[in-house]
Amino acid sequence: MNNIFKGLITAIITPFRDNKLDLNALEKILEYQINAEVNAVVIAGSTGEGSSLSFEEYKLLLQTAKDIVNKRIPVISGCSSNNTACAIELAAESTKIGVDGFMISPPSYLKPTQGGIYKHFEAIHEASNLPIMLYSVPSRTGVDFTDETILKLSKLSRILALKDAGIDLERPLRIKSVINKELNLLCGNDDLSLAFNAQGGVGCVSVASNITPKLCKELQEKWHNNDVKGALGIHQRLLPLYKALFVESNPIPVKYAMYYLGFCTNEIRLPLTEATDTTKKQIEEIITSLSIKV
């Protein structure tokens, strides 16, 4: 099975207008990513406010994204839920639509044991036939995979990657030392992506690449082509943007940045609220300093 989880993967925002999906804006956003030659996109993940969508909106968003992309790059659907049956349903609907893979985090709020986390993913795996990227994001879920659970899950044939949005930079080395199969490790934090790659990572699932996909793609390419100095130069240039995108809860700052660049409205769904004036000013200054052209 081809491993689609590598390189630069953009976690796409979901644009709204008058509290409805703005599908015209979605097309502009996706074409911007495709023109920058990103390796794949994630739809309806954390950055895409997936948990704030109705099931009908989720289906419409995925179908529209799949139609726009039209097989030019892989489309990965966020299928996370704290209800295993619902996660299976999201994966089943995604499969019908024709996505290329899933990104799934452990169930939030319920605080399952490691045994429960394993069974949750095993059930989704057995009910589907597409590749899965595990998504470690303990700051949101309240639980995380242990190394032992990752090792156990990696033995399931279609679990091919781990997106790690934690801060344990020793983890890639530990995992690589005990897992025999190809399990691609991707960083979920833009600001840590180079350090993560240095420990065995193969790419980044990025928020910042919504805004500047060409630079983010160039950074990953330079690193993997052993141009460490070039990659570090881009990383240092983008570091203020990385930091600004998390001064408030993601995706609040990135949604404003995309509005400022002219892609969409600044609408974001409750319980999230739009960026403060201080954050807006910071984002505007950074975008201006980067001379981003769209």
UniProtKB/Swiss-Prot annotation:
GO molecular function: (R,S)-4-hydroxy-2-oxoglutarate aldolase activity; 4-hydroxy-tetrahydrodipicolinate synthase activity
List of residues binding pyruvate: 47, 205
Keyword field contains Cell division: no
PROSITE patterns cross-referenced by the UniProt entry: DHDPS_1 (PS00665), DHDPS_2 (PS00666)
Sites marked Part of a proton relay during catalysis: 46, 109
GO biological process: diaminopimelate biosynthetic process; glyoxylate catabolic process; lysine biosynthetic process via diaminopimelate
Protein name: 4-hydroxy-tetrahydrodipicolinate synthase
Organism, scientific name: Rickettsia bellii (strain OSU 85-389)
UniProt gene name: dapA
